[in-house]
């Protein structure tokens, strides 16, 4: 990965970008075979890189400085992440891995000082892991208002009953943030949902059972778990914010998460592009290099355009968020466009690599399944397309027109 300062970008952000690239190039990418294998051999490598990241002031870019983070905004983070995400291992090594990063943001905004001390600080330091338990097998994941997991107050405790799945990181987690409602009835469409609440539940609480790891893309030993909650009791003080704030807390978490997913996708597709171009230059086929074939030249051109469009859309969305603007339409737009562009770029890179591209000898196969999954995670394409259209039409119905310059 070759990174140069971007003209017009602040010296601070350019410096962050260059220092991030140094660690990814020199430390993480060379260690990928060991990190992929995992086990005891990988742990000292991970520990060394994490300490190096902290020493160089690049730990937890999404968190404020008073909690040990970098305290940078969305725009600076976008420029950093497109470099950081060249390796799938970087996020954890830079302290910004989901779902921990999203849970940290929720705890920062909605947690009490006691909750921050007990749960947030160990989560930031790496002493704890967490998961976010929202999606349910019996309800549409794209409609959080349909959630049926119920929390009933009994004296100074919440009693939780429900069924969740696709709770990522559950087997590693020390605690879950569980999305619940406090009433049986789902509010009518268009009315505020004042029954939703997020509750911190330690994973060793009686009644909480990890039923299984849900197989994803044929992998049966993953960490996307199905969980049942049967008369799970936790203190009332474990609620995050007030009853009724749960839906907004979820939207805060998911909105930022969608942007982070897109930032990560930019870096990954950039690497896939680099691999594709280099492969086309090195590979001999039918009397010439792949790079001389017009089909492959088309792959390169189309991928260049996909990456530039995805990158600039994401940077613009991050700018709007930093400036405090209404970024809802932009968030939905990048959530639809970027994973689809990512999928297209990786698909072309696999095609240029041939059978090697679907093997475990390159990161491309993992990128491909990851890109396809992102078209469902944090809201499917169709929901976000509808939101974009509704926002645009609402603006026009109010007598305005759409200003793409803002």
Tell me the role of every PLM-derived stretch.
Residues 97-104:
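Short, conserved phosphate-binding/catalytic loop or strand-edge motifs used
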Residues 146, 204-233:
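Flexible, small-/acidic-enriched active-site or ligand-binding loops
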Residues 104-110, 133, 185:
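Flexible, glycine-rich active-site loops centered on histidine and acidic residues
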Residues 1-90, 97, 110-115, 122-127, ...:
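Alpha-helical interface subdomain recognition
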Residues 126-135, 179:
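A short, Trp-centered hydrophobic/proline-enriched beta-strand micro-motif
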Residues 140, 165-171, 219, 256-260, ...:
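Glycine-rich phosphate/pyrophosphate-binding beta-alpha loops
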Residues 123, 138-142, 166-169, 188-191, ...:
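Short Gly/Pro-enriched turn/cap motifs at secondary-structure boundaries
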Residues 148, 156-157, 161-210:
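A short core secondary-structure module
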């Amino acid at each position: 990965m070759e990174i140069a300062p971007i003209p017009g970008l602040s010296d601070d952000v350019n410096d962050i970008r260059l220092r991030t690239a140094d660690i990814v190039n020199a430390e993480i990418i060379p260690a990928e075979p060991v990190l992929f294998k995992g086990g005891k051999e990988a742990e000292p490598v991970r520990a060394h890189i994490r300490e190096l990241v902290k020493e160089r002031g690049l730990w937890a870019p999404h968190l404020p400085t008073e909690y040990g983070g970098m305290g940078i905004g969305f725009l600076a983070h976008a420029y950093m992440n497109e470099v950081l995400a060249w390796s799938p291992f970087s996020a954890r090594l830079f302290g910004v891995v989901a779902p921990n990063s999203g849970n940290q943001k929720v705890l920062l905004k909605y947690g009490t000082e006691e909750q921050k001390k007990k749960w947030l600080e160990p989560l930031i330091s790496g002493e704890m892991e967490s998961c976010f338990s929202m999606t349910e097998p019996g309800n549409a994941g794209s409609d959080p208002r349909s959630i049926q997991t119920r929390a009933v107050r009994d004296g100074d405790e919440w009693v939780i009953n429900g069924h969740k799945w696709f709770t990522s990181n559950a087997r590693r987690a020390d605690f879950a943030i569980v999305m619940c409602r406090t009433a049986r009835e789902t509010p009518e469409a268009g009315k505020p949902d004042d029954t939703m609440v997020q509750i911190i539940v330690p994973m060793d609480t009686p009644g909480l059972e990890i039923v299984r790891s849900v197989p994803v893309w044929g992998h049966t030993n993953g960490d996307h778990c199905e969980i049942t909650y049967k008369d799970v009791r936790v203190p009332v003080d474990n609620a995050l914010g007030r009853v009724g704030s749960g839906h907004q807390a979820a939207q805060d978490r998911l909105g930022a998460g969608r942007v982070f997913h897109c930032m990560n996708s930019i870096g990954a597709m950039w690497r896939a592009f680099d691999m594709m171009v280099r492969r086309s230059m090195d590979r001999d086929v039918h009397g010439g290099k792949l790079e001389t074939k017009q089909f492959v030249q088309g792959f390169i051109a189309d991928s260049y355009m996909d990456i530039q469009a995805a990158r600039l859309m994401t940077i613009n969305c991050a700018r709007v968020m930093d400036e405090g603007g209404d970024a809802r339409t932009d968030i939905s737009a990048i959530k639809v466009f970027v994973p689809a562009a990512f999928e297209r770029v990786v698909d072309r890179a696999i095609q240029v690599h041939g059978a090697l591209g679907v093997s475990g000898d390159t990161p491309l196969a993992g990128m491909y399944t990851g890109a396809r999954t992102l078209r469902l995670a944090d809201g499917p394409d169709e929901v976000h397309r509808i939101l974009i259209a509704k926002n645009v039409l609402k603006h026009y119905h109010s007598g305005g027109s759409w200003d793409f310059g803002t």
